Every structure is written in C-alpha cells, then in structure tokens.
Amino acid sequence: MRVTGITPQDLKAYGINDIQEVVYNPDYDTLYREELDPSLEGYERGVLTDLGAVAVDTGIFTGRSPKDKYIVRDDTTRDTLWWSDNGKGKNDNKPLTPETWQHLKGLVTQQLSGKRLFIIDAFCGANPDSRLSVRFITEVAWQAHFVKNMFIRPSDDELEGFEPDFIVMNGAKCTNPDWQAQGLNSENFVAFNLTERMQLIGGTWYGGEMKKGMFSIMNYLLPLKGIASMHCSANVGEKGDVAVFFGLSGTGKTTLSTDPKRRLIGDDEHGWDDDGVFNFEGGCYAKTIRLSEEAEPDIYHAIRRDALLENVTVRDDGSIDFDDASKTENTRVSYPIYHIDNIVKPVSKAGHATKVIFLTADAFGVLPPVSRLTASQTQYHFLSGFTAKLAGTERGVTEPTPTFSACFGAAFLMLHPTQYSEVLVKRMQAAGAQAYLVNTGWNGTGKRISIKDTRAIIDAILNGSLDDAETFTLPLFNLAIPTSLPGVDERILDPRNTYASPEQWQEKAQQLAQLFISNFEKYTDTPAGAALVSAGPQR
C-alpha cells in the first residue's frame, strides 16, 4: 500500500478502512491519465475532446438534487438553522436525525473502504482568517479533478500543515436501501453534519453537489460573524471599483462578470468583510449550452487541457456539439480561474463593492432590462430573489418557470433570509453602494434580451452613465428606468414598448405583481419585513 501525505490512521478516524492506495493531491497530469484510463467503466471514464479538455457524464443527475438534501438537527443547529418544517419560508433544509446520519455515514464509509482513493485538500475562501480547510475523499478521479478546479489550491507549504476543518466524503456509487423506512425522499442523499463538520454524498454523480455543499456551509458560518455570504459573481475595474452580480444559475453571473475591461474576482460565490469582497473558490463553473467562441470568447478559450466538461455531446472525432441539449440544458465546464486571463492576482479579492447588480431572467417579459433601486427596493428585491428557474439547473425542470429564491440563492441558505439581507445592507451602506435590477430574460417579443444589449447596460452601470441618465417610473412596480443609454435600443428600455399594446403588458404585469405580493407575505410577520411591502409592486 502506497500512501503519500495522509496515513491509514487519518482515514480510520473517518471510518474508512483497508484502503488499497491513496492518491493524495494529484497534479493535473496525473488526473488526466487517471480519468482517461481505458479500463474504467460507466460514469468514471472520461472522453478526450478536440479542445484538450476531458468530458464526463453524470448520468441522470445532471443538476443538484435539492429534495435529497438533509442537515442533522442537533444542539448545534436546532436554534440557528432555517428549517424546512419551521416558519413560513419554503426551503430545502430538511432535518435528519443523528441516528439516520450514522446509517448514511456507514454506507459511504463502507463504499470507500478497501478502495483506491483520491484525496484533495483545498481551501474554501480566499481570506485566511475566514476560510475553510476542506478535505475531499472520493474513489472517482474526475471528481477529484472537479474539486481541484473549483476550490483554492494550497501551496506545498500550506499542505504540510493542513488540518481539515471540514470533510466531504463522496460515495456516488452507494445508495440508501432503507430510505423509505427512514422517511427520506429517495435512495440518494446529500447530507450535512455541522457538529461533525462533514458532508456525505450518495447516489448522485453530479459534481456541483460538492461545490454547493461547501457554499452552504460558508452561508452558515460567515453571516454569524457579520460577514456577507453571497451567491454572486464579482469583478473590479482599473480604478479599483468593485461590482457584484447576484443571480441564480443561468441568469448571466459568469458571462457578465467575465469582461475584457475588468478583472474577474470570481464567478459565483463571494464574501464581503471589513477588507472588501473575496472569492470562495479557485475556479469557475460555466454553463456551456449553445456556447460560441464569438459570443463568449473568454469562456470558450478556457476550455482546454485541465478543464472538465460535464454532459456535453462529444462527436466521434472529439469535437463538441455545444448546441445539443439532449442530455441536459445544464451542460457545464469547470476550470481553474487562471484559465481566464483577466483575473485579480495573486489572491481573488478586492476592495468594497460600489455597484450591486441583481440579475433576473423574467419569464413573463414584464420587468425592464434595467432599473435603479432605492434602498428599500434593494432589500425587497434581494429578499424576493425573483427569476425564472432556467431549464436544467435542477432535475425535472425543462421549461422556464417563474420562481422566487430568497437572496438569489435560497437553495444554499442555512440561516433565515433576513439575516443575509441585514448583513448585505450594512456592507452596502458602509461602502455607499448602489443597487440595480437587470433583466437578462425575455420581453414582449418572446425573445430573450440580447447579450449585446445587456453588456451595454452593465457598462452604463459601471461607468456611472446610468446614474446620470434621466429616468421615468414604471407603473405598478414603481421602478426607475432610464430614458436612454449608450449602445442600447431605446425602445426596449420600457418593456411596454415590446408588446402589441400597453394593455397586454398591464395584464401580465398585474399577474406578476400578484406573485411578488403573495411571495413576500412570508416576511410580513416581522416589523422590518412589513415595512418593506411598500417597496414592492402594488395591487
């Protein structure tokens, strides 16, 4: 048995016994050879593409499985967590008994015992004083590759004294036969224990469960320290001006923050502390459906050796059909952040944000492409988190459907949404930041607003020209809309212009306004929440 960097005793402490071999923190060349090994079968085996990146399939699990997510309810979490069975807000934080946790842990450790394992030690969080040291344990080479791409890679010196704060054991090949007797959703599980500081994965091969699992943990720990934890991308301009982009999967966080005129801090998960905005990750996880070199050159060129593609269609000659959504709309690529040339170096962090952008993909075609928010509207729309749940980011979702996701990331919140709102508002007020609502979705034509127009809108926000523009108020929603912006077709700025008649817009707008009002009722049981009702659409 060969073991490098970790001992059998380390693994026995987790319940993993009789290991054949540990491949500890392998380099990219090793992972490349391992995942292309012709003796591998099924979802373990990767395919080489003509761009140099390896592609893998994740089976039926082409997105997260929120219905299979559980958190142990014990003395650590009982009074702090936002539980699915407590209060008005709907969420995925289903309680798990310590007894069922022990059963699931036994299944995963049994699966990993006696195997050849890949172990990756990495950091979550770019700031040493608040980062998590995470140990990922898996028997699948490409899953190790995924976390090596997505998390912050320690230096050799940092690895020498590495003590994990959190353990992730991925037993994708095992399932739970006793799920019905235990009152669970299915044989698959993604379970967390905040006391043991551990995540267990069973049944699902989707790599994003490891990424979003650690994001959920940061979302638990940081706000309790007064640090904002945000589902957003972030970049910084030449003058040090920082912008953050909130939004659910597929609304444009990665695309819009990857800007040749600005340096990327990160594309999905960030904190905001006394020093400024910092990335949680060491990589990017971009959607690739209908990707083209012309429309998104930075992401396209990041797909090369060491990138890892998921669920794309690879032709016999190794070329990729990015337009093929037969497996899923949620085709993805993970790559280390340095595959993007224009990034903040050497550490993915910058100063305080002055521009806060809420991205929404409005399936109704009601909201304007851009509006400038007041302070109370900022809180209202942050807590509402309206968007369309875009096809494929969760299993079973194939058509755009309207949804409300608190803080633009309810699936990853472990505390009540108002706790995130309070911390964000404090950070924004201290920095003098301004918020904007940007619709990257549809309008009355039935077509999606073009990336070209959205980029011109983002430019106007970042260079200050939107703040100087004349505005008018959109009825019902009371949103301040610019009358004109450089490089943007003026006719689309007022969504009513994209309908055959203003009455058609009014009808859809009343429908959407009612959805906003109904959704926000869950926050009206507190004085602070009730005070924000007037900042939203009115009947």
Swiss-Prot record:
Pathway in which this enzyme or protein is active: Carbohydrate biosynthesis; gluconeogenesis
Drop me one GO molecular function for this one: ATP binding
- Assigned protein family: Belongs to the phosphoenolpyruvate carboxykinase (ATP) family.
What residues does substrate bind to? 64, 206, 212, 332
Gene, per the UniProt record: pckA
List the protein's name.
Answer: Phosphoenolpyruvate carboxykinase (ATP)
GO biological process terms held by the UniProt record: gluconeogenesis
Co-factor remark: Binds 1 Mn(2+) ion per subunit.
UniProt: ATP binding residues: 212, 231, 247-255, 296, 332, 448-449, 454
InterPro entries, A to Z: PEP_carboxykinase_ATP, PEP_carboxykinase_C, PEP_carboxykinase_N, PEPCK_ATP_CS
